[in-house]
Amino acid sequence: EHFRSLPPIINFSNKEFYGGRIKVMRRNDNSKKVLETVVVPDGKVDFDATRNLPEIEALVKRLHEIVVEDERKNPDNPVSIGIISPFRAQVEQLKISVAKVLSEHMMEKHQIEIGTAHTFQGDERDIILTSWAYANNSFPQSLIFLQKPNLFNVAITRARYQLINFISKDPRELPEGILRSYLGFVQEYEDRYALSKSDDFDENVYKNAFEKEVAQAFRDLGHEVTCGVDIAGLSADLVVDNKFVIECDGVEDKTPCKVSN
């Protein structure tokens, strides 16, 4: 049983790493965007290939906005905030940059912790901001390092209420792997969230043409079909007659990963 994270935050990990064995005990909250990816268009890594200053600037700007808004709306019950990056050089520069915009008092008040995934093992925060520090000029070895399953799993499951990803490369241009799959999952969530807030919302928004074809085939047989339903921490592709779950796998190749607790 999992009590920490809202369903969208834990769903990817539950499916990719745990085979759906986790039972998520928290209910979804659609009042606020839970997952987000910020692509930094001018981001690039410097000489050591792991420090990305434009990405740090974008993250620190967003951090400051979060703190200012929280101080205005919720001064007596501040949110806790964590900042994660896979790379030590990025972490050290983040510490320097954050200290320039937030006082020591504010950092303590919001329990701001900055570190690698190792730092956050067994820990959690209300909001997590993750700097993947990956850009068009990054070395391929960097991607191999940041996609180590155990550490990747820790990085994406520390947030209780919100997880914001920062990356300096279009996720669609990433090589096949965990990071691309994960950011694709986040994009699907963002698209569905945006539609749910628009006047043109249609609950039957499909991930791909195959899923739509399967859903229509069941409707033609007289069944009621709903798409993208959160069930115990898993996002079911299709639910038929509120009784049966259909997973439309095989349309997009994904590498299965196993991770230990």
Question: What is each of the regions a protein language model found here?
Answer:
Residues E1-Y18:
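ASCE P-loop NTPase helicase motor core
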Residues N14, R27, N137-V229, D237:
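Helicase C-terminal subdomain and adjacent C-terminal extension
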Residues G20-A99:
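Conserved helicase/translocase motor-coupling segment
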Residues K32-L35, H110, E124-I127, A159-L163:
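Short glycine-/polar-rich loops that comprise or flank the Walker A/P-loop
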Residues G82, A99-T116, E224-G228:
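Conserved RecA-like helicase motor-core motifs
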Residues S85-A89, I114-F120:
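Conserved helicase motor
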Residues G115, D123-A135, V154, L163-I164:
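A short beta-strand element within the Helicase C-terminal
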Residues A236-N261:
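Short beta-strand-loop-alpha-helix junction that forms the active-site gateway
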